[in-house]
Structure formats: C-alpha cells, structure tokens
Design a protein with these regions (language model features):
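Bacterial N-terminal signal peptides that target proteins for export
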Residues: 2-13
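A short aromatic-anchored loop/beta-hairpin motif
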Residues: 28-167, 171-217
Length: 217
C-alpha cells in the first residue's frame, strides 16, 4: 500500500511538472526578440549596447548605444559617446520639417551635438532628463526623447532640460541582424545608467559601460 501511494504521488508530481512546462511555452514563444542568457530572456530595450574589442565596423568601435526598441522588425538606438562638436542653432532648426521662422536672435547660439548612428543622419533626437516634457516627448527607462524645434529654443534660452544630448542620426538593425552580431561577440549588454549618459565625459562612457556589462552572448 505504501509503495502504491508513493507511485501515485510520483505520477501526480510528474503530471504537474509537464503541465507547468507546457503552460510557459506561450510565454517563451512571445519573446523571439529577447536574448537567452542561462535560463532568462533579456530584452536589449532599455539597456546599453556596448561594443566589444571584437567589433570590426570602425564606425562602432568603442561605442555605447542606448537601446530604445527591439521587435519583429528589428532594433534601434542612439550612440551617446561620439561628439561631433558645436554648431549654431540655425543648423539644427534648418534640418527640422516643422521649423518656424521665429526667435532668430537665438540662431547664432552654439550647441554641442553627437553622432547617433549612420541611419538618417539629418534626423535630430534630443535625449534628456525626465523633468522636461512637451507634446512630442516619449518616456523611456530613466530618460526621455523629444523631437521638435521648441526644445531647441528652450535649450538655447537655458529653459530646457537639466541634462541632455542632441543627437543626429540613429543606429538600426534589421530583423535578425543584431542577434547575429551578438552571437559573434561584437556587442555586450550593460545596465542603462543616466549618469553615464549625461554626466560622464564622452571618453569615459565606453570604459564605464563596459565595466558594468553583465551579459556576454
């Protein structure tokens, strides 16, 4: 009788494990754009994508990228440690489709800009701290992005966000492309840190982000 009860308990336990396994299959199937590390799926969104020493593309050597999305169409983000220099506000306003012929007295104010990646390098992204917002602001983990001329005027008048980067262009990957680059160790992931984004000197961002990396695929 004791052996029979033990077999019954074992049978029900195994049945429970099988049912539990199949119950999580839909969850695994819904995460094709996440990256398997051990037993956990990690999304690149809201992380730093950090170039390793194995990076072969000279444009991305020692880059740190804030990853803003990854889905079935691919992934994209903004490089944060490649300064271009300072340009007059006029240059930035002229690149915007919704530019307004106003506040021309501010056009000569020089503003530092960064290279965000090789895709659509005339597009402007203002990556900034979260206390500032307007109708075009999108919020992410610990940071925000605004993409209109109003924030540029606010920055020129010292009325903008406390911390910001003005970035031209972005970095993008087609479906499956980033996975392939990570599989050959061109990239690792690191926790997104707003202090590294806004407060570290550009030359220190890559060493800091690389030091904090936690996923090597």
């Amino acid at each position: 009788m004791v052996h029979r009860n033990c077999r019954a308990i074992l049978f029900y336990f195994i049945t429970f494990l099988i049912a539990a396994f199949y119950s999580i299959l839909p969850t695994l199937a819904e995460a094709p754009k996440n990256y398997l590390k051990g037993k956990f799926y990690i999304s690149v969104k809201d992380h730093f994508l950090v170039a390793t020493e194995k990076m072969t593309d000279n444009r991305f050597k020692k880059t740190v990228i804030v990853m803003l999305d990854n889905d079935e169409e691919g992934a994209w983000g903004l490089v944060i440690n490649k300064p271009i220099g300072k340009v007059p506000l006029r240059f930035l306003i002229n690149t915007l489709q919704d530019q307004k012929n106003e506040k021309k007295e501010l056009y000569s104010v020089e503003i530092p800009i960064f290279w965000g990646g090789p895709v659509d390098e005339k597009q402007i992204y203002i990556l900034h701290s979260k206390e500032y917002k307007n109708d075009t602001t999108k919020n992410y983990k610990g940071i925000s992005i605004t993409r209109d001329y109003k924030i540029l005027f606010d920055i020129a008048e010292n009325k903008g966000p406390q911390r910001y980067l003005i970035i031209l262009g972005y970095s993008g990957w087609a479906d499956g492309q980033l996975e392939g680059e990570m599989e050959v160790d061109h990239w690792i992931l690191s926790e997104l840190d707003s202090q590294i984004i806004f407060e570290e000197e550009s030359k220190n961002k890559w060493p800091k982000a690389y030091e904090n990396s936690f996923i090597r695929l």
